């Protein structure tokens, strides 16, 4: 019998976090080569400061090193500075380490609060 896809999901972020001025909050997640149809979905809302803004990005762990240091990086998702954001992006199959980050490094004085939920979804082939 041929293998069939089984859907899995995992919360990457849920609830509320504080992101200080000049700082970032991030979560690292690992994808295995057996994962297929990988998608990150979710919603977030930001409070704090005059602009109530944050930047959400998803990229590989190596690109995150460049991003964190202010260098050019390849990202699979970039919200830009925003108050409210919806994430619905695919990540290429093949495995690797990735990072979901909420960036407030551009804020000189104001910390931000980010509320929301972001989920990693994928399929793995298995026997019925």
Set out the residue ranges of the language-model regions:
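Acidic, Ser/Thr/Pro
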Residues: 1-128
């Amino acid at each position: 019998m041929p293998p069939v896809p089984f859907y899995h999901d995992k919360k990457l972020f849920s609830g509320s976090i504080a992101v200080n001025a000049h700082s970032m909050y991030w979560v690292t997640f690992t994808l295995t080569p057996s994962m297929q149809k990988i998608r990150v979905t979710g919603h977030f809302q930001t409070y704090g400061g005059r602009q109530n803004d944050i930047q959400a990005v998803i990229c590989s762990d190596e690109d995150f090193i460049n991003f964190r240091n202010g260098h050019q990086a390849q990202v699979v998702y970039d919200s830009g500075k925003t108050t409210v954001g919806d994430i619905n992006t695919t990540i290429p199959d093949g495995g690797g380490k990735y990072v979901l980050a909420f960036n407030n490094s551009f804020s000189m004085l104001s910390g931000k609060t980010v509320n929301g939920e972001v989920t990693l979804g994928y399929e793995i082939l298995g026997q019925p």
